[in-house]
């Protein structure tokens, strides 16, 4: 699930720490500057310059950013209103933070960071999809037992799909299936009867195959539409590379919604 709550009080500021400075985690640091009720006083990354870069992208002057090697140094910096960068993510666990956002992109590290944060009474936002799909359910159970919140991060395809499914169910609709836009793009070149695929692959279509990709117009002939769709799917299933991102993201959705993965290579 994606955790949501009632709006927090106008004068409440959530203190959160970020581990990892990939694209998504860095976006949290930069966007926090536009959210009065969110403060990111500390960022951890094994590459200190990457952590500094996150604050630079957020418009924070270098004079306001310090590097800390110990908890005492980090705490002193936070208390003085500085932005702190550290190489050791475990320094965040014993600081006055309510939430840890884990964004290393490493499944094992993400699991250990999240488990440690929960042990130290921190809520956890899991950005690392590789961790969420493997042990997210277990971490969520631990959080619930401790009276804490563990949630996947909002804003990416899995969370948006989960939210849509939840909304449909809340208004009484039965959800039969769910899906997302695949990571692999296929470009249909009808004039030249070609399909352009990933890794610079091109497939020349026979006329009968090319006809499958013409717009389906004309009388509302259900059997024709179904037949054409099935034939398209049969052709594409032989060509599409299954991307890890697709498997991970739809695995997250399946875990969160109780929809099952019907086919190992997914439907396309």
Give the location of each predicted region.
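Core active-site phosphate/anionic-ligand binding loop and the adjoining beta-turn-alpha structural block
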Residues: 137, 149-268
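Glycine-enriched alpha-helix->loop->beta-strand junction motifs that scaffold or abut catalytic
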Residues: 96-97, 121-123
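Conserved beta-strand edge residues that scaffold enzyme active sites
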Residues: 47, 106, 131-132, 157, ...
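N-terminal glycine-/serine-/threonine-rich beta1-alpha1-beta2 phosphate-ribose binding loop
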Residues: 1-116
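Rossmann-fold NAD(P)-binding glycine/threonine-rich loop
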Residues: 107-120, 128-156, 161-167
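Conserved active-site and cofactor/substrate-binding residues in soluble primary-metabolism enzymes
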Residues: 19, 23, 46-50, 87, ...
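Short catalytic-loop micro-motif centered on adjacent basic/acidic residues
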Residues: 41-42, 100-102, 125-127, 150-153, ...
